[in-house]
């Protein structure tokens, strides 16, 4: 009798634990359908830093694309779904946040060398990299080119990104009530020597590929009383 009770208790505990673990999965499975772009609220959107990444790739000796990232960056987006071409985006990047996963940390701090070296990002003298859009051109139902000014190392040059609208919610799942969410992917290529960053060219490539994955969320939408 005692053994049967113990087995029942163990099974009950396992079932209860499984139910708890399944709850987030069930909630995700019941996420609402994405909204049409025209249904999303107009206004200012801020970057969801938990769900955003900024990586870049550069050729190393023509053998591989060396990949690194910035972990400290921010962006804001102004959007009017009825006039997507009027969208504007601004971004700031902290060059001190560059990460390369350099494997020999005991040998040298390569991330710090890239961030602060006068021949690299020289963050002590130029602590911020900025991007400000100047034009958005639609290229498809969910795609556009975003042209803007990239300022780095005290030099400002135009850059064009190819952006894809991944989708949006008028009520972003797991967000506070009234918060909309949208997502974009974007890629672009710059010639680093245009900003005076020409160290080791051409052994280390001049062309740098930029890859952005971003989610933005709106401020809570205030519901007007009937």
Regions found by a protein language model. Name each.
Residues 4-17:
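Bacterial N-terminal signal peptides that target proteins for export
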Residues 24-26:
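N-terminal signal peptide c-region/cleavage motif recognized by signal peptidases
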Residues 20-21:
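Hydrophobic alpha-helical transmembrane segments of integral membrane proteins
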Residues 29-226:
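Low-complexity, acidic/polar, glycine-enriched regions of mature
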